């Protein structure tokens, strides 16, 4: 702790208490505010006039926590104080903010893993014996909640990932609560109470089933409270729009999408996910070769988790001709903010509408394929990744394979590319109907796409040469091997409510598009 004369006191190596991750920073007390600034520049400020009460608690043998109760029911905590800091903090709060006393509270330290869990304002609180708090954390930290498919008495909470954390930092990613079935009441003879049915049989099983249903219902209510409170803590109120029963390929299932001003919520049969818009890194839209379905892909950084499985890409499939009617809950402020992008009533193609809304809310451009065409005229090549058949889309600065697993490969990460099983058709017995494509990455891993139709080789070879990707074993014989040096770019998708591609924008400075410097270099080469 470093301290200067009042009215300023400063404490180093302080983290926001009660958070799942513990990014450190500097805490400064000034006349009007308490300000915390993290190592990466994030700032949290508490006005001195908003402080109602202050508590002091030991959280480890050597580390103490300052707990501030704020007007409106919120709680702000700061971890990292030393025992000798108590008197400095107490005196400052009393003299400068007229907040006293700095009450010392005792947390449960017995290590019990059983107790009562409840929602206390914006916090989830776990209490043990004699009502002592074992731990608590903000509901806003919860990214998703899951009731086990095979164990209906278990609720799993997963937490948001803090991008500011280093790779070697530790953070909690998951917590599970188990609700045991309450024992049946004992009868006068010390056994279970027994009910007798109309047929004279004892209905012990019915009683146990009723108790089990009661416990499961309580767990589901607790889960719903968490998700509802999660929205309330974010001060977002009612959702802007809901898309019901949308077909997801990854993760698989029919999922409802609820969109809010700062995040979207995915609600499935067994899982709920909360996805902040700031974690959406890219948006893609690809037509399937049959032109009857559209892939819409939401790339996430960090990915969401389902148990031990991470989903870095959400893959949605729409019918190309599906039209819907939407009514958006836009406040006057939101209407003013998105006046050129969103309107209270929207009609049109389902895919185009969700693209338009997400583009407005996230500020991300939607990348669609450029001018690459396969032998059949499609923007993709049919192939398999491991045992899963799908489509490989060559884009301006990356490859994207849809859909299982969805795989994103940036050109800058590629070391070289190798063709396999491509036999020259002029050699008897040397011709294969399919060939394989191995993409070797700079991190020494390799991704192999197999069972590509040999007719796709010329267009794929030309594309790789145009992008100046290193090919280890090029086959340049044959009449079709002519490099088509056009300045094709992936277009930015400007979704129209009709869903047609006639309103697509031209190339700009999006990361998936070709830079002006690259274009000038190509023109010089042509000259």
Curated annotation (Swiss-Prot):
GO cellular component: FACT complex
InterPro entries tied to this protein: PH-like_dom_sf, RTT106/SPT16-like_middle_dom, RTT106/SSRP1_HistChap/FACT, SSRP1-like_PH1, SSRP1/POB3, SSRP1/POB3_N, SSRP1_DD, SSRP1_sf
One GO biological process term: DNA repair
Localization per Swiss-Prot or TrEMBL: Nucleus; Chromosome
Predominant place of localization: nucleus
Superkingdom of this protein's organism: Eukaryota
Residue ranges, compositional bias (Acidic residues): 199-213, 483-516
Region (Disordered), start-end ranges: 179-213, 479-527
Gene3D superfamilies in the cross-refs: 2.30.29.150, Pleckstrin-homology domain (PH domain)/Phosphotyrosine-binding domain (PTB) (2.30.29.30), Structure-specific recognition protein (SSRP1) (2.30.29.220)
GO molecular function annotations of the record: DNA binding; histone binding; identical protein binding; nucleosome binding
Keyword field: Chromosome, DNA damage, DNA repair, DNA replication, Nucleus, Transcription, Transcription regulation
Skewed-composition ranges (Basic and acidic residues): 183-198
UniProt cross-references to SUPFAM superfamilies, sorted A to Z: PH domain-like
Functional summary from the UniProt entry: Component of the FACT complex, a general chromatin factor that acts to reorganize nucleosomes. The FACT complex is involved in multiple processes that require DNA as a template such as mRNA elongation, DNA replication and DNA repair. During transcription elongation the FACT complex acts as a histone chaperone that both destabilizes and restores nucleosomal structure.
Entry similarity comment: Belongs to the SSRP1 family.
Assembly mode: Forms a stable heterodimer with spt16. The spt16-ssrp1 dimer associates with a HMG box DNA-binding domain protein, probably nhp6, to form the FACT complex.
Protein name per Swiss-Prot or TrEMBL: FACT complex subunit SSRP1
């Amino acid at each position: 702790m470093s301290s200067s004369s009042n009215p300023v006191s400063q404490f180093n190596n302080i983290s926001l208490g009660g958070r799942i991750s513990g990014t450190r920073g500097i805490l400064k007390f000034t006349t009007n505010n308490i300000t915390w600034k993290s190592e990466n520049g994030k700032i949290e400020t508490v006005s001195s006039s908003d402080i109602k009460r202050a508590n002091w608690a030991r959280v480890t043998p050597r580390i103490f926590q300052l707990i501030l109760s704020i007007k409106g029911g919120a709680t702000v905590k700061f971890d990292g104080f030393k025992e000798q800091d108590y008197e400095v903090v107490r005196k400052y709060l009393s003299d400068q903010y007229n907040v006293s006393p700095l009450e010392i509270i005792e947390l449960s330290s017995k290590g019990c893993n059983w107790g009562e869990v409840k929602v206390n304002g914006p916090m989830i609180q776990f209490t043990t014996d004699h009502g002592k708090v074992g731990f608590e954390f903000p509901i806003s930290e919860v990214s998703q909640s899951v009731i086990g498919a095979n164990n209906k008495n278990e609720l799993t909470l997963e937490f948001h990932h803090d991008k500011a954390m280093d790779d070697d930092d530790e953070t909690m990613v998951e917590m599970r609560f188990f609700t045991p079935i309450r024992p049946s009441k004992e009868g006068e003879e010390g056994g279970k109470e027994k009910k007798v049915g109309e047929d004279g049989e004892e209905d012990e099983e019915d009683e146990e089933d009723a108790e089990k249903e009661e416990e499961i219902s309580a767990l589901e209510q607790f889960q719903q409270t968490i998700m509802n409170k999660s929205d309330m803590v974010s001060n977002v109120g009612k959702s802007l729009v809901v898309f019901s029963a949308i077909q997801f390929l990854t993760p698989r299932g029919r999922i409802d999408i609820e969109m809010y001003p700062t995040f979207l919520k995915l609600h499935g049969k067994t899982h709920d996910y909360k996805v902040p818009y700031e974690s959406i890194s890219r948006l893609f839209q690809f037509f399937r070769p049959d032109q009857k379905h559209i892939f819409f892909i939401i790339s996430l950084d960090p990915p969401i988790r389902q148990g031990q499985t991470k989903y870095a890409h959400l893959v949605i499939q729409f019918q190309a001709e599906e039209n819907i009617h939407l009514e958006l809950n836009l406040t006057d402020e939101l209407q003013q903010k998105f006046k050129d992008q969103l309107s209270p009533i929207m009609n049109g193609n389902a895919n185009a509408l969700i693209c338009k809304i997400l583009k407005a809310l996230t500020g991300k451009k939607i990348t669609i394929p450029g001018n690459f065409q396969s032998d059949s005229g499609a923007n993709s090549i049919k192939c398999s990744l491991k045992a899963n058949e799908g489509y490989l889309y060559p884009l301006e600065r990356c490859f994207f394979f849809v859909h299982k697993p969805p795989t994103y490969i940036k050109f800058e990460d590629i070391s070289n590319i190798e063709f396999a099983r491509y036999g020259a058709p002029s050699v008897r017995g040397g011709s294969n109907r399919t060939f394989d494509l191995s993409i070797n990455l700079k991190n020494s891993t390799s991704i192999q796409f197999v069972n590509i139709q040999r007719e796709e080789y010329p267009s794929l070879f030309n594309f790789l040469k145009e992008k100046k990707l290193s090919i280890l074993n090029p086959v340049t014989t044959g009449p079709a091997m002519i490099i088509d040096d056009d300045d094709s770019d992936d277009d930015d998708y400007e979704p129209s409510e009709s869903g047609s591609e006639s309103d697509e924008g031209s190339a700009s400075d999006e990361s998936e598009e070709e830079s002006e410097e690259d274009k000038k270099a190509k023109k010089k080469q042509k000259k």
